[in-house]
């Protein structure tokens, strides 16, 4: 019981990172700690953005921090929750079949979409923010309980700064740069 309690506390940790969040309106930071398992280009995103995007998929192992952070400053303009299955998070179909929660963030220059996806162990997607709430870059807004994956959709003209296999840290690692006009 003691070991289980220690792991439970370890798993639900949310380290403070406010002092070292990368500055700049053009930078998009990782929404989660984990490993980049896919970077796709020209993905048609119809849920919120309605355009071709880059999709960055981040797998969260049971050893990663499972709190999710806002990739950029903005306001939550879209929010949805979908019940679903609990397939392993590394399967390609999880984004369509598993339980998931999505938020669309309207930024000063462009919009992005973040989807939290539950997995075989992760049975709950939790959001602490509501539609209309403002978010600062790196601010905590949700959690996937017991690991899974996070998908980040960013505009197609943005520069991608990560590749498959990279380790990222939520609120710290720059995953993309917007082209500001």
Give short role names for the model-derived ranges.
Residues 1-181:
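Contiguous, well-folded functional domains in the mature portion of proteins
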């Amino acid at each position: 019981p003691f070991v289980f309690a220690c792991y439970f506390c370890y798993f639900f940790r949310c380290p403070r990172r406010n002092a070292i969040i990368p500055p700049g309106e053009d930078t998009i930071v990782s929404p989660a700690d984990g490993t980049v398992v896919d970077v796709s280009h020209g993905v048609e995103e119809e849920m919120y953005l309605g355009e071709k995007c880059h999709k960055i998929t981040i797998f969260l192992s049971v050893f990663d921090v499972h709190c999710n952070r806002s990739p950029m400053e903005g306001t939550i303009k879209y929010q949805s929750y979908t019940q679903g299955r609990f397939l392993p998070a590394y399967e390609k179909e999880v984004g369509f079949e598993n339980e998931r929660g999505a938020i669309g963030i309207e930024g000063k220059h462009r919009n992005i979409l973040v989807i939290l996806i539950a997995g075989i162990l992760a049975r709950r997607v939790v959001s602490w923010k509501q539609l209309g709430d403002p978010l600062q870059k790196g601010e905590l807004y949700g959690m996937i309980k017991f690991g899974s994956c996070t998908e980040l959709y960013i505009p197609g003209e943005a520069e991608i700064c990560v590749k498959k296999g990279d380790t990222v840290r939520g609120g710290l690692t720059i995953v993309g740069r917007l082209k500001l006009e």
